[in-house]
Amino acid sequence: MAKKGSGLLVKLVSSEGTGYFYVKKRDPKKLVEKLSFRKYDPVARKHVLFKEEKLR
């Protein structure tokens, strides 16, 4: 079987403060700045900005 990529798992936390988060894999070699996405937060029931944090 093929090896899994050497991607880094990061947590995308809602800026709304609901505690909802997504987990995403990213390539540490390509990206220098932190990720931020506008995604759906089901707790807030709207699209909000999600910012990258370290996954513990």
UniProtKB/Swiss-Prot annotation:
Highest taxon above the source species: Bacteria
Family: Belongs to the bacterial ribosomal protein bL33 family.
GO biological process terms on file: translation
Coiled-coil annotated residue ranges, if any: none
Protein name: Large ribosomal subunit protein bL33
NCBIfam families: PRK00595.1, rpmG_bact
GO cellular component terms listed in the entry, alphabetical order: cytoplasm; large ribosomal subunit
HAMAP family xref list: Ribosomal_bL33
Record's keyword terms, sorted: Ribonucleoprotein, Ribosomal protein
S-S pairs: none
SUPFAM superfamilies in the cross-refs: Zn-binding ribosomal proteins (SSF57829)
GO molecular function, one term: structural constituent of ribosome
InterPro entries from the UniProt entry: Ribosomal_bL33 (IPR001705), Ribosomal_bL33_sf (IPR038584), Ribosomal_zn-bd (IPR011332)
Organism of this sequence: Anaplasma marginale (strain Florida)
